[in-house]
């Protein structure tokens, strides 16, 4: 919608100004541990692990830390018996905005308590499993950065089995996001790379089926503070919400 920022745009704008620049070293390391535990501890044969390693390297995590995380996931790192669980939490923000939280935790009681406190202090509430997840579909999303020839992108998207794509141009950032089914993410990523597109990220993302417009300054401020509080928790890997915010309110609250 013209004049409003979708959730993906909101995330990009926030990360440009957040001191933590998105995910912390600990969060990225945990993603590597879980990926190595779920599949082969070799990135050449484990797409989830390969993607997690690429994100870690982009964030500046040293190779030594990456190798240690892989070893922990494979169970070959001495004196470490920590077991992380992947858990999805659900809740509501101010004005009934639906929020999904993906966490990696070694203590689900601690994580639930931290999330409940963050919600309650900022006008939301942590809900039961299933209360909002029906409002989202999980998709594979590939980020392309830089100038994009739309005709070439359309051709590559069809060849790779993409569902759709969206071009974006924000401030000095231009590029595209390409969407596909979860099971097709690796194939499409490879196709786009072979076609010489500048693929910088491939991830699984929850996409809202419909979005709520936020035009009230106080609601916008409260929502963004809640998102910040949730993202700052060590156990939280990703936060997704189903609101769009008026661009002038977005700039006023992230500047």
Curated annotation (Swiss-Prot):
Keywords: Cytoplasm, DNA-binding, Transcription, Transcription regulation. One of its GO terms (biological process) is regulation of DNA-templated transcription. The keyword Transcription applies. InterPro entries: Integrase-like_N, TACO1_YebC-like_2nd/3rd_dom, TACO1_YebC_N, Transcrip_reg_TACO1-like, Transcrip_reg_TACO1-like_dom3, YebC-like. One of its GO terms (cellular component) is cytosol. It is found in: Cytoplasm. Its main location: cytoplasm. One of its GO terms (molecular function) is DNA binding. Disulfide bonds: none annotated. Coiled coil: none annotated. PANTHER family: TRANSCRIPTIONAL REGULATORY PROTEIN YEBC-RELATED, TRANSLATIONAL ACTIVATOR OF CYTOCHROME C OXIDASE 1. NCBIfam families: PRK00110.1, PRK12378.1, YebC/PmpR family DNA-binding transcriptional regulator. Belongs to the TACO1 family. This is Probable transcriptional regulatory protein PCC8801_2028. The lineage of its organism: Bacteria, Bacillati, Cyanobacteriota, Cyanophyceae, Oscillatoriophycideae.
